[in-house]
Amino acid sequence: SGILNPVTKIDILKETPTTAVLDANDGMGMVASKKAMDMCIEKAHKYGMQVILDVVFNHTAEGNEKGPIFSFKGFDNRIYYMLTPEGWYYNFSGCGNTLNCNHPVVQQLILECLRYWTIEYHVDGFRFDLASILTRDEKGTPMADPPLLQAIACDAILGKVKLIAEAWDAGGLYQVGSFPSWNRWSEWNGRYRDDIRQFLKGTDGMAGTAITRITGSKDLYPEPRGDSASVNFVTCHDGFTLYDLYAYNTKHNEKNGWNNTDGDNNGNSWNCGAEGETDDPQIEGLRRRMVKNAFATLLCSRGPAMFYGGDEFCNTQFGNNNAYCQDIIISWLDWTRQE
């Protein structure tokens, strides 16, 4: 049965794949009409849900400098991308290229995009993927006061929307607790995730650190920012699901095609006595208690709580902690697990 059953009672979510705003049999899928998107957001608002749009302004699909031309490379390569003196792409995104976000042209593009979603679709906020890239200048150097982030924070149209940063990038820049905020930006608290995972699995010496995280991470978010700047989470779309966190000691990404070399190798997981699916009722019972422990800790912590869709009914990705590339049962929500 589900851990948080009420979360699963919204019919439109049960009928909607996570990769589309319409029913999968509709024929339009991810390229649904504006009307359908409006309807989806309106329905969410009717149920008292706010809609936070995940936006990726850190790279495009063109890969590295040897990749194809899909979008901005053909317009003005030097304006839209961070380039080395030799003309190669800086790769702070892990995807082969990095968008030159603080160039005035790119900055204006991003601002207009955010305004459009706010005005036309009435989204309630934005979560910025690998947001530390948005703090870098054209050479990749982090800036104390990035013009793009300041412009977003001070924009009149965006003044009431929520701004949430994934405060790190694939180039090693980690800004949890130090992301430029103008008292507007919240952050995914990656320290909360890592420390609470270790505490819950029984790692020695973590009790004091866990108390700090549960009580609002004041070491990271002192006033005036405070605990409202800390988006607490134990799991997200990157990494193990919450059930898998207590069902697998190691990742199992073999079906991704990279010989299990992709994905995080340090998930602080614990399989509770058996690797993967098991019929042992004691092990399965322990796993469900651990999931409940994680939810109880998360929901009793100071600051906004976030959990991964499906964790409330112990959804599994069968040990795959990098399932973005899978469109099979590995990445699907199995609603029968709430029964």
Explain the meaning of each model-derived region:
Residues D23, G96-L99, S132-I133, C272-E284, ...:
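Glycine- and acidic
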Residues A44, D54, W117, F128, ...:
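Conserved, mostly hydrophobic/aromatic
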Residues S71-P85, W185-R197, I328-W335:
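Acidic, His- and aromatic-enriched active-site or binding-groove loops in soluble protein domains
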Residues H122, E138-K139, M143-G309, Y324-Q326:
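Conserved alpha/beta catalytic core and glycan-binding cleft of carbohydrate-active enzymes
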Residues G319, A323-S331:
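Aromatic-rich peripheral "rim/lid" segments of glycoside hydrolase catalytic domains that contact
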